[in-house]
Amino acid sequence: MSVVVYAPASIGNVSVGFDVLGAAVSPIDGTLLGDRVLVELGSEAFTLATAGSFVDKLPENPKDNIVYDCWCVFSRELNKKNVALKNVHMILEKNMPIGSGLGSSACSIVAALDALNQFHDNPLNDMELLALMGEMEGQISGGIHYDNVAPCYLGGLQLMVEELGIISQEVPCFDEWYWVMAYPGIKVSTAEAREILPSQYRRQDVIAHGRNLAGFIHACYSKQPELAAKMIKDVVAEPYRERLLPNFAKAREYAASAGALTTGISGSGPTLFSICKDKDVADRVSRWLQENYVQNNEGFVHVCRLDKQGSQVTGSKL
């Protein structure tokens, strides 16, 4: 018996919701922009192999890999429930660049924990599993946050509420939007990107942030795409982080001139996203970003839609 789970890329913050909004995305051409994890019966308690486009960026020692930590916390939770743990052999297919702003660590965490749960006949419910995912994300970035793992696992546009036992809930978004994702091929550390943020904010910035986020959520629920796009502004992180992203200002300027609704930093960067309301504009922006924002062979641009499914079982073989 074996199971393979695919976990998609995600946009943390979506500019307007620092640490409280996240969106899962998938390329419209069918490319798998995300990680896959296989779990099968093993001869020992835990063994791990690695594969994929970015396998050379992973630690050599399996016990230094986040997938091992996922297995440890999953084992801990099963012990609490008196559920027997099976011996597992796991394979992480690492297709997501590390430090990309695409929720790379979330992809590995979500795929690993979802696959382990599926392999053991789902002893943990969605919120229990999501809590573990946030714990693992915190281990990497220095603080528990769900804005990548929640959309990666549950799909769609997710708002972190963290009340009444609910970690996140889906917010209705706009099916007609194209999300152009451009990764330049360089790395930005999440921890480094957090360190450059100020420890305190001016009152007018706090007010603007509250207005933008409330306005965006209102526009999503009242089905006003133009207003929603206008409210996607970042006064919390982007003014400080954009200097970490070469050509970001030029890219945003070009995208606006080409007809994009808005452009922002995905997570802590260096990936950016541009939202477009029609395919022609998305293709035009995509071509420009490929020629002017991508810096090396590891970079890429994808035209995406919101991924409403999140992580999913794709079969039993990689």
Swiss-Prot record:
ATP binds at P97, I98, G99, S100, G101, L102, G103, S104, S105, A106, C107. Its EC number is 2.7.1.39. Pfam families: GHMP_kinases_C, GHMP_kinases_N. It is found in: Cytoplasm. Transmembrane segments: none annotated. Its main location: cytoplasm. Keywords: Amino-acid biosynthesis, ATP-binding, Cytoplasm, Kinase, Nucleotide-binding, Threonine biosynthesis, Transferase. InterPro entries: GHMP_kinase_C_dom (IPR013750), GHMP_kinase_C_sf (IPR036554), GHMP_kinase_N_dom (IPR006204), GHMP_knse_ATP-bd_CS (IPR006203), Homoserine_kinase (IPR000870), Ribosomal_Su5_D2-typ_SF (IPR020568), Ribsml_uS5_D2-typ_fold_subgr (IPR014721). Pathway: Amino-acid biosynthesis; L-threonine biosynthesis; L-threonine from L-aspartate: step 4/5. GO terms for cellular component: cytoplasm. GO terms for molecular function: ATP binding; homoserine kinase activity. It catalyses: L-homoserine + ATP = O-phospho-L-homoserine + ADP + H(+). Gene3D superfamilies: 3.30.230.10, GHMP kinase, C-terminal domain. GO terms for biological process: threonine biosynthetic process. It is an enzyme of class 2 (transferase). Catalyzes the ATP-dependent phosphorylation of L-homoserine to L-homoserine phosphate. Belongs to the GHMP kinase family. Homoserine kinase subfamily. This is Homoserine kinase.
